[in-house]
From Swiss-Prot:
Signal peptide: none annotated. One of its GO terms (biological process) is translation. It comes from Rickettsia prowazekii (strain Madrid E). This is Small ribosomal subunit protein uS15. HAMAP family: Ribosomal_uS15_B. Belongs to the universal ribosomal protein uS15 family.
Length: 91
């Protein structure tokens, strides 16, 4: 259900702005998106797992707040990020 350390390092390399960047909003959104996708796969076979569903909603809300922050500060970076992550625009 959680992502591996190798996958997390791969996401950090892909979305980092500088070499030692591990906490920028783009990196955080990428990691949250990976966790959300893993939980979505989990629910295909465990549809009664309501506790994890609550965790999923918390992760989606956290990602939405980060994306709103990026959208407010840099619209072009926001559009680039959502296209790379494969998610829809926030209304």
């Amino acid at each position: 259900m959680s992502i591996t350390t190798e996958r997390k390092q791969q996401l950090i390399k892909e979305y980092a702005i500088t070499e030692n960047d591990t906490g920028s909003t783009a990196v955080q959104c990428a990691i949250l998106t990976e966790r959300i996708n893993n939980l979505t796969e989990h629910f295909k076979s465990n549809h009664k797992d309501h506790t994890s569903r609550r965790g999923l909603l918390i992760l989606v809300g956290r990602r939405r707040r980060l994306l709103n922050y990026i959208k407010k500060n840099n619209v072009s970076e926001y559009l680039d990020l959502i296209s790379k992550l494969g998610i829809r625009k926030i209304k």
